A protein has these predicted regions:
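Solvent-exposed loop and beta-edge segments used for protein-protein assembly and interaction
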Residues: 47-49, 70, 101-105, 138-140, ...
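Short, charged interaction patches at domain edges and termini
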Residues: 93-126
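Oligomerization/assembly interface segments of phage tail-like spikes and tubes
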Residues: 31-61, 103-116, 206
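Short polybasic amphipathic segments
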Residues: 1-7, 74-76, 154-156, 180-184
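Solvent-exposed edge beta-strands and adjacent loop segments
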Residues: 1-50, 83-97
């Protein structure tokens, strides 16, 4: 069985013909052949392609309930791996009524999964103030979300190097490293920032230091792996 946004498919009496296995994502590697040179030139961009899958089955619910259950984007989790999930986007959905009353449906859903498996534990909050030591035990860089409470100008130092400074903070500021956005109450703070958002390096410990008038830092690491 699967869970969509932590809701079990059995709640809607969904039965799958067969659950797909999720392959490893394809790495974006380009091979170029150069005249007068043996072999080829390999350009590895260090990124991965999304993973297409199809879910086929039957459901004992209404059509609108089935469509609302999967939505357009969300989190997909398998009961066999409850500690991990994929972020997905629905690319196509086909639903047919098997019975005239519309309470037995046949469906096929095409999804595009992001290349990374996310750790459920990566949603847990890590709380500190002036320093944080974060060990990434996984094979992919993690892009955290931070809420920094404080006032004035606040700086972030990663492994001894200042990477970001934000001014004119009142009460708090949010930093979404995955979306590369700095904001407070949906007001963009990019014009008040110097530097870049950051990631937590794969298979390493990242030391963060926060300078300025900081009272508390709340960080969600978003651990993930390939």
């Amino acid at each position: 069985m699967i869970l969509i946004n932590d809701k079990n498919c059995s709640d809607l009496k969904i039965v799958f013909s067969e659950l797909p296995s999720i392959p490893k994502p394809v790495r974006n590697v380009e091979e170029k052949f150069v005249s007068g040179r043996d072999g080829s030139l390999i350009i590895d961009r260090g990124t991965y392609q999304n993973i297409p899958i199809m879910l086929i089955g039957h459901a004992g619910c209404k059509r609108t309930e089935l469509i609302d259950y999967f939505g357009t984007t969300g989190e997909l989790k398998f009961e066999t791996s409850p500690d991990r999930f994929w972020k997905y986007r629905v690319t196509a959905i086909d639903v047919k009524e098997v019975l005239d009353d519309g309470v037995l449906l046949a469906f096929s859903i095409n999804m595009s999964l992001g290349p990374h498996k996310y750790l459920v534990s990566g949603k847990s909050k890590i709380i500190g103030s002036s320093t944080l030591s974060l060990k990434n035990d996984y094979n992919a860089n993690a892009y955290p979300f931070l809420k920094i409470k404080g006032t004035g100008t606040i700086g972030i130092i990663k492994n001894g190097i200042q990477i970001l400074s934000i001014k004119d903070i009142t009460d708090y500021v949010d930093i979404d490293c995955e979306a590369d956005v700095i904001h407070r109450n949906n007001v963009n703070y990019d014009n008040k920032a110097i530097g870049d958002t950051f990631y937590l390096d794969a298979n390493k410990t990242t030391e963060l230091k926060f300078t300025g008038n900081v009272s508390e830092v709340i960080l969600i690491p978003n651990w993930r792996e390939i």
